[in-house]
């Protein structure tokens, strides 16, 4: 395609996007206001809980005001973290110096947090999801709906699975996903950003005002400082959200080696190609345009590769020679860099399915992280990338 044709095509896309009329923020009501619960209270979990609680408080015609947030209880200088959150209205360990709404209630009991919820927002490190949903089985409303803010996959003998699909499989409830160019501290400080929510209205949808749909989800997550676009491509935003963390490790490696912005840009270019290829190969229902047009796609890739935990961990690995696991413990204050476990999961799946050679960047990140391959070998390892057509 000629450069002028590409420019015209891009202009048409942007013009169409700007002309779209957004009716999703018009008045929405519910016959019985929906109760919302958040599972997870780390840096991002607390930030999303803040967003949600602000909206439930402002929209009593649609949501019950109180939002319960499940907290894995721990002691902070001899005081339970839940007690600190509920009295000082700050998560002093994972989101310090950010005031939380008074209607956000920290709860150390997972079942009491979620048993009456109509909407459950999952926001925990994805390696803990299996243990959490196993406790919730049979303990929640059968017609509850869910949104996963997790980044990663469930890899098993039968293949690679979206975490939203895993939640649906294990709990029998419809689950969507939220992902975007969202560094938690910036959202928590109410610096303007945007995100993507993906949700497919299920076959058993009970009707407007009786069930969760795109309009309700926009009302739940959209804030003046946190703009939301709701789509139906759950696979697309989930794939992009998981794999961008692996790409970010690669960017951290070259940053730590002192190779500069050109090298980081090359990693992102290769990474975007492999993300799209992965979606096409293993989740054909995903839409290529999601990666380009949504915050959850290339925008999130750029943001994550410019900062965040995965880049920090990989940069420190390059500078110190320490393992990813050790660096994670040293600098993340109990949080996790999801790219480390995702790189291993993706490798396991690509190896079992015989596709490792088609994803040289993903494989290089795995080999450097877990097989002690020197980071300086990264350029030669990704040189033979098959371009996505």
Swiss-Prot record:
PROSITE patterns: NAD_G3PDH. The keyword Oxidoreductase applies. GO terms for molecular function: glycerol-3-phosphate dehydrogenase (NAD+) activity; NAD binding; protein homodimerization activity. One of its GO terms (biological process) is glycerol-3-phosphate catabolic process. Keywords: Cytoplasm, NAD, Oxidoreductase. GO terms for cellular component: cytosol; nucleus. It catalyses: sn-glycerol 3-phosphate + NAD(+) = dihydroxyacetone phosphate + NADH + H(+). The active site is at 244 (proton acceptor). NAD(+) binds at residues 40-45, 128, 151, 184, 309, 338. Substrate binds at residues 151, 309-310. It is found in: Cytoplasm. Belongs to the NAD-dependent glycerol-3-phosphate dehydrogenase family. NCBIfam families: glycerol3P_DH. This is Glycerol-3-phosphate dehydrogenase [NAD(+)] 2. It comes from Zygosaccharomyces rouxii.
């Amino acid at each position: 395609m000629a450069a002028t044709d590409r420019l015209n095509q891009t202009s048409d896309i942007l013009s169409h996007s700007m002309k779209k009329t957004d009716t999703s923020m018009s008045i929405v009501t519910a016959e019985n206001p929906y109760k919302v619960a958040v599972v997870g209270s780390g840096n991002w979990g607390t930030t999303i809980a803040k967003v949600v609680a602000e909206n439930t408080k402002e929209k009593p015609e649609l949501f019950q005001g109180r939002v319960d947030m499940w907290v894995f209880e721990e002691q902070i200088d001899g005081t339970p973290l839940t007690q600190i959150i509920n009295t000082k209205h700050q998560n002093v360990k994972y989101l310090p110096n950010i005031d939380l709404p008074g209607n956000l209630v920290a709860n150390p009991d997972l079942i009491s947090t979620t048993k009456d919820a109509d909407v459950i927002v999952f926001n925990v490190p994805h390696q803990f999801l299996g243990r959490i949903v196993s406790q919730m089985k049979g303990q929640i409303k059968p017609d509850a709906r869910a949104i996963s803010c997790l980044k990663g996959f469930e890899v098993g003998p039968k293949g690679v699975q979206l975490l939203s699909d895993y939640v649906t499989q294990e709990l029998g409830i419809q689950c969507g996903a939220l992902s975007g160019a969202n560094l938690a501290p910036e959202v928590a400080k109410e610096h303007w950003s945007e995100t993507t929510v993906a949700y497919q209205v299920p076959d058993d949808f009970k009707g407007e005002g009786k069930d969760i749909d795109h309009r309700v989800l926009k009302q739940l997550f959209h804030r003046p400082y946190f703009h939301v676009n709701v789509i139906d491509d759950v696979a697309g935003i989930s794939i992009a959200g998981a794999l961008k963390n692996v790409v970010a490790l690669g960017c951290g490696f070259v940053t730590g080696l002192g190779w500069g912005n050109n090298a980081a840009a090359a990693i992102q270019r290769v990474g975007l190609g492999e993300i799209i290829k992965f979606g096409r190969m293993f989740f054909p229902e995903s839409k290529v345009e999601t990666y380009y047009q949504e915050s959850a796609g290339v925008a999130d890739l750029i943001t994550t590769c410019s900062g965040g935990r995965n880049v920090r961990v990989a940069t420190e690995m390059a500078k110190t020679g320490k393992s990813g696991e050790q660096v994670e413990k040293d600098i993340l204050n109990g949080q996790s860099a999801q790219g480390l476990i995702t790189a291993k999961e993706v490798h396991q799946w690509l190896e079992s399915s015989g596709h490792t050679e088609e994803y040289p960047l993903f494989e290089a990140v795995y080999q450097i992280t877990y097989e002690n391959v020197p980071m300086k070998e990264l350029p030669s390892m990704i040189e033979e990338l098959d371009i996505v057509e």
